[in-house]
Structure formats: structure tokens, C-alpha cells
Amino acid sequence: RGLGAPDCIILPGTKNTVDDLLWLRQSGLEAAILKLAERGTPILGVCGGYQMLGQTLDDPTGSESGRQQTLRGLGLLPTRTVFSEQKRRVQVKATVAAAPFAGAELEGYEIHTGVTEAEGEPFAHYPDGGREGCVQGNVFGTYLHGLFDTGTLTEALAGWLCRRKGIDPSDAALIPMEEYRRQQFDILADGVRGALDMDAVYAAMGMEKR
């Protein structure tokens, strides 16, 4: 199965890293991703996607997959993940360390099982100086959800991808996630108003039409 010529590949989080890794492998998508990574296509793995990008995924108690096993990862990052029954749930702030996004401020959360040991360069640093995630060449991995909510990483990533294609980043119209959400809620509200008899709604509520 081919993926065409994407500007970037994002492997998202998953409810079951092991099962979805096996599906990637069996479907042929793993081979396609590896081929594109070798050609220099940027790969970003988030949470379970980050775990998949590593060398091995060890499930010693069967807490993730239902049986004891060690799986080969995609091998694109120098990391090893060991699953456990404990789940990490935490709100975090971090600063991206990885070029070309260095300096982007992040505010998000982690929610995952497993501990990942990384030997490569970190994707980001916590305020206390702790390392988060891993980077190797054009492959990036992080446990942080909400990467694109603050907008700074979104702008940095979009600008970098534009420059790789010879496009002026100033031509890319970007809006903060919160503003985008408000716009979508306004569109939804307008759609609801257009589909309802608002006079009847206000009358039923004992309110005057605004």
C-alpha cells in the first residue's frame, strides 16, 4: 500500500499500540512509512505513535496486548518502551528543543502506559530541564498531546514544510486553535438557528426574540 508523496506523516496516539503496530505491519503501511522516512519525509509520532517508532516494545505482563511479548518497532528512533499497568496522566508544559522548531512553547498533557528510554536528542525540555521525547534526523517522537493547540509549533511546522517546498510561509494563513474552535461553534450555531423555528423556541422558553 502506498502513501503517495506526503509533506509530513503523523502517527497519532492509539488505544492499543501493539495491535495498531501489527496492523501497520500487516497492511503494508509500515513498509511505505519506512521508505518515505529513508527519502527524508518528516515523521512525527505522538504517544502510541512515538512508541511505535522505536526499536522495541516490551509487554512483560501482557498489560497492553493481553499476552507477554516483545515486538520490533519501526526502528526509526533509538528508543525502547516497556509497558506496565500504571498509566501516566499529567498536564505538562515544555519547550521544543528539536530543530527546526526549537523554542516553540507547548502546553498539553500526557496519558499513556509504558516507559520509554531514549538515547537520541530530546524533542522538548520540561521547565525543570527534564528531557521529553526523541529526535533522530527527520523523525520526531513525543508523548505530548495538544501539540498544536497553542499555535507556536503549528506555525513553526507549517513554515518549515512550506520552505521545504519553496513556498513563502507568509502565504500560509494560520489561526490559533481557540479562534478556530470559536469559528466552528459559530457556524454550528448558525446552522441550528437556520434549521429551527426560533420564534417558537423563544415562545416556549417565555423569552422575547433577540
In which residue ranges do the predicted regions lie?
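Short, well-ordered loop/turn and helix-capping segments at boundaries between secondary-structure elements
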Residues: 39, 55-59, 79-83, 117, ...
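Terminal amphipathic helices with adjacent charged low-complexity linkers/tails
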Residues: 3-12
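Acyltransferase
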Residues: 4, 131-210
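Catalytic beta-strand/loop cores that center a nucleophilic Ser/Cys/Thr
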Residues: 95-137
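Cysteine-nucleophile active-site neighborhood
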Residues: 15-98, 102-107
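Active-site-proximal beta-strand elements of phosphoester/diester hydrolases
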Residues: 12, 108-112, 140-144
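A glycine-rich phosphate-binding loop feature that marks nucleotide/adenosyl-phosphate handling sites
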Residues: 1-4, 42, 49, 90-94, ...
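Residue-level signal for inorganic ion chemistry
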Residues: 9, 47, 145
